């Protein structure tokens, strides 16, 4: 499994990161930061799906190899951030804040930050400044995708064969409809949950 360098995709990444930076820099009257996160999700989904489908069609797909490469790519930066954040948090946070930080650290380590912050109401209530690992929610969504989607594609390619596209399309349509319904009744769920983000 390998990626061919795509300058066009790097350009999309640059475009996507700009609204995220502007939003977190608290630029006045700027409200479009969340769009950048969606673009990153689309890029990741496109790249991973392309590579997985190529490997499956060539008969050289390996779950262990896929997971190993994801781990080698993501874990060094992830745990560097977690270690540095924990050192700083232990120095500047109050005990009550450290308790909440410990819970978010645990969820970040096990890749369920999105659900941790979803039940904590995330961006929609407490100030983000008191949640230094809040940004880990998007990585958790990606990791859940990396864990589950290869298994689905492998099984679908064996049992559905030429209908993988139809089966995947049905799942994505269900995800889209789900996100549309809950955005009005449970906005935090629509924002953080993986089923609502899958499409």
Task: Show which residues each predicted segment covers.
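Membrane-interface helix/loop caps of multi-pass membrane proteins
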Residues: 1-199
